[in-house]
Amino acid sequence: MKLSFNTWPYSCFPIWVPSYPLEEAIKRIAKIGYDGIEIGAAAPHAYPKYLNPARRKEIKQILDDNGIALSSMLPAPGGGPGFNPSSPLAEERAEMLDQYQQVIELCAQWGGKTVIYLAGWQVYGTSRKQAWEWSREGLVKVAKMAADHGVTMVVEPQAVDTNLIEGCDDAIQMMEEVGAPNVKLMFDTIHVMYRNEVPSDYVYQMGKNLHHVHISDTDRLPPGQGRGDFISVVNALKEVDFEGYLTMEIGFHRRDIEPDKVAREAYAYMKPLVG
């Protein structure tokens, strides 16, 4: 089990929190002690179209020089430059495929092996069945792209942000319907708690298909500062022999945060638990 930190609180997403260049975020996160870094493929850090070949090589060298691995990547969220895999617009779904292709290639270039699949949301006037089918069809195609680069796609249930894949059963159903060996599962503790469910239950339900985990206490606080039971989560992960990354996705819930502080606090709390 390894610890990773997501770059959102260093990137001005989704609100105008302090913004730092990607290389600065990498150095700070590595200095704290994290094994990995999860990079959002969005401006200002890593929107693929904004990164020329020289810049890509530069970031890979910075990762190597600081002894930190790319644990995972995820695309720009919906809205703005983002996209909806379940969109009724064929053009938007096509853009989703192009964007995922670019994110997968970038992830592989930087030594990463995991990309998060955000299934999208049902738009008014579209049936849930149709929205689901569009998202499923998209993931089938994306999984083939990822397989060519040795990348695993992980389906994330997002109760706070979507109305399509909200819980554990939804994610498992999507994975099973796609049926690709490189499509696995993940969960974020804040989404589980939003549904008034128990995060450690997700560990047991996902079992051997659990590939990645996001750690966040209530209100995107560092673990140990809200109501989350992370001792039980880690104990459950040990029981199922989880060997992936626990990524802190925290600290972007308000403007006046200090990203180094929340990163240190999360590491100090989680490191003794994982050993």
Which residues does each PLM region occupy?
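N-terminal pre-domain/capping segments
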Residues: 1-112, 140, 147, 180, ...
